[in-house]
């Protein structure tokens, strides 16, 4: 029996690159979008279902990297109106949202839709998403099925700032394998 000595030498090193402004900007984009993605991960998992071998997180990052801008002072910002919380082949649902009251209440108004073979079924589940951008918190709201018209009211959580809330919607098939693209819903206020 032979006794051999295995010696492994590891060199611990930091990053030794000399980053160009483009590299620094890309790192800021990834850091900013990654921080948001971790906060809204349950929405991403539902909205990027069935993306294949990649993860829902990677699909979200890939779809939304263009929504992050970095200025010359290396300050990053996200265009929340263009943000995609879901991506897929289904047709987007027809939903409108209004905000009313002193304790803010969001009313989602759905229009009944017809079935389209392969792209929209009457039993597709429609979801609304309330996103508070300052706190980076989200609330997933289950609305009615695609074939049903109606309204769903959701009160705004007390600690949320109503001026910083963005609203989105998307549809998910009954088996939750196919989704639609998400749609940013402009808010109309009523007195």
Name every feature range the model reports, one short phrase each.
Residues 1-94:
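Long, polar/Ser/Thr-enriched low-complexity segments
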